[in-house]
């Protein structure tokens, strides 16, 4: 499956990536290759294989909750397309009822 330039441009826009023409073509080739691989995997007969949600038997391995310095809010929001009152502003995904 060869991706169109429009799809690559759309994915780049969603990821907020500014791509050069060379990067766009490389991304097109790589994403097309990944989708072809996934397509081959989907063709496999897995009926006799039980679903596996967890392959490692470890559970609840926690680390200490240490407070560490973080970036100032202003520095983080400087990279956001939109912000408001110290928060990221995003477009609504769900309609209000």
UniProtKB/Swiss-Prot annotation:
InterPro entries: Asp/Glu-ADT_sf_sub_c, GatC. GO terms for biological process: glutaminyl-tRNAGln biosynthesis via transamidation; regulation of translational fidelity; translation. It catalyses: L-glutamyl-tRNA(Gln) + L-glutamine + ATP + H2O = L-glutaminyl-tRNA(Gln) + L-glutamate + ADP + phosphate + H(+); L-aspartyl-tRNA(Asn) + L-glutamine + ATP + H2O = L-asparaginyl-tRNA(Asn) + L-glutamate + ADP + phosphate + 2 H(+). One of its GO terms (molecular function) is asparaginyl-tRNA synthase (glutamine-hydrolyzing) activity. Its EC number is 6.3.5.-. It is an enzyme of class 6 (ligase). Pfam families: GatC (PF02686). The keyword Zinc does not apply. Keywords: ATP-binding, Ligase, Nucleotide-binding, Protein biosynthesis. Heterotrimer of A, B and C subunits. Belongs to the GatC family. Allows the formation of correctly charged Asn-tRNA(Asn) or Gln-tRNA(Gln) through the transamidation of misacylated Asp-tRNA(Asn) or Glu-tRNA(Gln) in organisms which lack either or both of asparaginyl-tRNA or glutaminyl-tRNA synthetases. The reaction takes place in the presence of glutamine and ATP through an activated phospho-Asp-tRNA(Asn) or phospho-Glu-tRNA(Gln). This is Aspartyl/glutamyl-tRNA(Asn/Gln) amidotransferase subunit C. It comes from Thermomicrobium roseum (strain ATCC 27502 / DSM 5159 / P-2).
């Amino acid at each position: 499956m060869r991706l169109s330039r429009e799809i690559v441009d759309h994915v780049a826009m969603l990821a907020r990536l500014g791509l050069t023409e060379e990067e766009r073509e490389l991304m097109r080739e790589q994403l097309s290759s990944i989708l072809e691989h996934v397509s081959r995997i989907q063709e496999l007969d897995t009926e006799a294989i039980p679903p596996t949600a967890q392959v490692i038997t470890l559970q609840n391995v926690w680390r200490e909750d240490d407070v560490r310095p973080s970036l100032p809010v202003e520095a983080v929001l400087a990279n956001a397309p939109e912000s408001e009152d110290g928060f990221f502003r995003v477009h609504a995904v769900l309609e209000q009822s």
